[in-house]
């Protein structure tokens, strides 16, 4: 028998329905906890649901259902309330049974049955052109926690990072590294303001020099600048000046490719691998892992980009204008049509994105979840439109948006960037407040809500700090169990009937709700629901701990209370693990 009272009550109600209205025996039963404790432990509106199709008064129908409800010693009281609700008050044994179930199942309590549903979650996928910043951190924490929640709920999950290793941004990184490298050999090319500025580029240049000396420095300043339009004065911010800077950058990239020749792919690969490796290490330290790192370049190498565009063309969704190929995305709800292949023959980023999603569908996932920054909201219609245009079901793709996190210190909004103009990095944040606080605070709100990240609160060792408060509850249980020093088997044999007071029964009810919270968090893509649950569970435990002694003289009462405490510890540890947070045994 399940210790979940909802399962028990649902079975009882369905049995009654088979007698009263067999044609409606498969009706979904909704059970909720009443807001007022005086209304019992659970209430259902099934009589209100069926009153109209059965042409019966809902209160009369509720009374009929109660008359046919099988007797159960786990239900203490039933009543018809209000317009036709049925309230249930559970017997103490039904409430405390969850303790034994938690102790028996351990880390598997709350784990959902295998659903045979393949889910792909793609997240972070930051351009490997610089260190991960605090914005990437929220996407990483959310994506990792969501993946773990889905996995715990019973889904077959693949965690994926899309590596943007093709295209202009990587060329700009390679150029930036090479120009800084040349400067180490006295070749001082004026550094473009639209190249990558961070100190990490200088560090990469030094690494390139240390590994290969002056192998890539056999050029002159004139050769590097040959044919470029030059840079406008820094004060100019007009569109013409911006365009000139972009043309100058493109000219430098073309010259780098020509002058380096066969060595250009190596410099390009060196810069990519340095940044990608740094990002991997950063995420690994953050407890964020991926099953697959998917290369954008592979889409071109395998011809999938060309095949995807050709398929759209074959289906009549492509037209040519001014030498470029355009996708008719306005036919699918987008605000304007989009270029997929430029007049120079190069494919756009959107084209590779179409190919990547085609690849996801061809890999046979039942559900595809993309986690994007909230600023990419407008990108959704064109991607879903392309999927539909390829003859694939766009509803299989779901996009979860992540808002940026804002840092606060001393109650004041703090700068999100350093002197060099770079965003505060994820590594800097982790080093200041710790991994646990980062992982927990990042998922304290719905992903599409703005997040105010209070640095002082995240570092504080107080009850106001939610992660500290939860971890402290876990450590408190560990301390009590260590003082006791007995064997786990003694707790599994405890007489749970000794759990009688209001706080103990409330804790049992909270524990029993964990499996439902897991399924809800998975269904809503909302790991914050587990964070909220853990805060409530910790609050219930601290309240009980402060009011009652665990190690009392009465052996039966002591074992029952220790069993309840051990069950709380198990669920706290399991819930924190799903969120990527540790559960220390002492604090």
UniProtKB/Swiss-Prot annotation:
Q: Which InterPro entries match?
A: aa-tRNA-synth_I_CS (IPR001412), Arg-tRNA-ligase (IPR001278), Arg-tRNA-synth_N (IPR005148), Arg-tRNA-synth_N_sf (IPR036695), ArgRS_core (IPR035684), DALR_anticod-bd (IPR008909), Rossmann-like_a/b/a_fold (IPR014729), tRNAsynth_Ia_anticodon-bd (IPR009080)
GO cellular component terms, A-Z: cytoplasm
Listed A to Z, the keywords are: Aminoacyl-tRNA synthetase, ATP-binding, Cytoplasm, Ligase, Nucleotide-binding, Protein biosynthesis
Where does the motif 'HIGH' region lie?
Answer: 126-136
One annotated GO biological process = arginyl-tRNA aminoacylation
For this UniProt entry, the molecular function terms from Gene Ontology, in alphabetical order, are: arginine-tRNA ligase activity; ATP binding
Q: Where in the cell is it found?
A: Cytoplasm
What are the EC numbers? Answer: 6.1.1.19
Primary localization: cytoplasm
Similarity field: Belongs to the class-I aminoacyl-tRNA synthetase family.
- This protein is called Arginine--tRNA ligase
Q: Which organism is it from?
A: Azoarcus sp. (strain BH72)
């Amino acid at each position: 028998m399940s210790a979940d009272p909802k399962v028990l009550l649902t079975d009882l109600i369905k049995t009654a329905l088979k007698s009263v209205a067999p044609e409606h025996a498969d009706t979904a039963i909704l059970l909720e906890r009443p807001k007022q404790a005086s209304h019992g432990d659970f209430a259902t509106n099934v009589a209100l649901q069926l009153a109209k199709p059965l042409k019966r008064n809902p209160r009369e129908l509720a009374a009929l259902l109660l008359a046919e409800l099988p007797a159960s010693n786990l239900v203490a009281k039933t009543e018809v309330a209000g317009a036709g609700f049925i309230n249930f008050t559970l017997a103490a044994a039904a409430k405390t049974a969850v303790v034994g179930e938690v102790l028996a199942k351990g880390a598997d309590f709350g784990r959902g049955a295998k659903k045979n549903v393949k889910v792909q979650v793609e997240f972070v996928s930051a351009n490997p052109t610089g260190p991960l910043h605090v914005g990437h951190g929220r996407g990483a924490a959310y994506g990792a926690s969501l993946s773990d929640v889905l996995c715990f709920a019973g889904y077959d999950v693949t965690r994926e990072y899309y590596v943007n290793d093709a295209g202009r941004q990587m060329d700009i990184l390679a150029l930036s590294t090479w120009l800084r490298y040349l400067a180490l050999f006295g070749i001082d090319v004026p550094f473009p303001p639209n190249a990558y500025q961070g100190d990490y580029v200088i560090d990469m240049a030094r690494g390139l020099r240390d590994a290969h000396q002056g192998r890539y420095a056999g050029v002159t300043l004139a050769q590097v600048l040959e044919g470029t339009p030059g840079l406008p004065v820094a004060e100019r911010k007009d569109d013409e000046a911006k365009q000139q800077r972009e043309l100058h950058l493109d000219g430098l990239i073309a010259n780098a490719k020509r002058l380096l020749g066969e060595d250009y792919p190596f410099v390009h690969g060196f810069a990519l691998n340095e940044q990608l490796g740094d990002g991997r290490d950063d995420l690994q330290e953050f407890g964020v892992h991926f099953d697959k790192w998917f290369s954008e370049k592979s889409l071109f190498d395998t011809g999938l980009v060309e095949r995807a565009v050709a398929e759209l063309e074959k289906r009549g969704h492509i037209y040519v204008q001014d030498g470029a190929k355009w996708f008719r995305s306005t036919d699918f709800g987008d605000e304007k049509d989009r270029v997929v292949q430029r007049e120079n023959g190069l494919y756009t980023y959107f084209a590779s994105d179409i190919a990547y999603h085609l690849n996801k569908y061809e890999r046979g996932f039942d559900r595809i979840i993309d986690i994007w920054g909230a600023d990419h909201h407008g990108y959704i219609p064109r991607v879903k439109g392309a999927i539909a245009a390829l003859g694939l079901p766009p509803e299989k793709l779901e996009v979860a948006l992540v808002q940026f996190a804002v840092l606060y210190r001393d109650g004041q909004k703090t700068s999100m960037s350093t002197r060099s103009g770079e965003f505060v990095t994820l590594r800097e944040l982790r080093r200041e407040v710790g991994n646990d606080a980062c992982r927990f605070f990042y998922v304290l709100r719905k992903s599409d809500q703005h997040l105010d990240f209070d640095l002082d609160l995240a570092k504080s060792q107080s009850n106001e700090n939610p992660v500290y408060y939860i971890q402290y509850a876990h450590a408190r249980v560990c301390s009590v169990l260590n003082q006791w020093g007995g064997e786990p088997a003694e707790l599994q044999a405890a007489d749970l009937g000794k759990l009688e007071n209001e706080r103990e029964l409330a804790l049992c009810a909270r524990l029993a709700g964990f499996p439902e919270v897991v399924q809800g968090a998975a269904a809503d893509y909302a790991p914050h629901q587990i964070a909220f649950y853990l805060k409530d569970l910790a609050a219930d435990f601290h309240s009980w701990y402060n009011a009652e002694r665990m190690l009392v003289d009465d052996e039966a009462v002591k074992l029952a209370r220790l069993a309840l405490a051990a069950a709380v510890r198990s669920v706290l540890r399991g819930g924190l693990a799903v969120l990527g947070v540790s559960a220390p045994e002492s604090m």
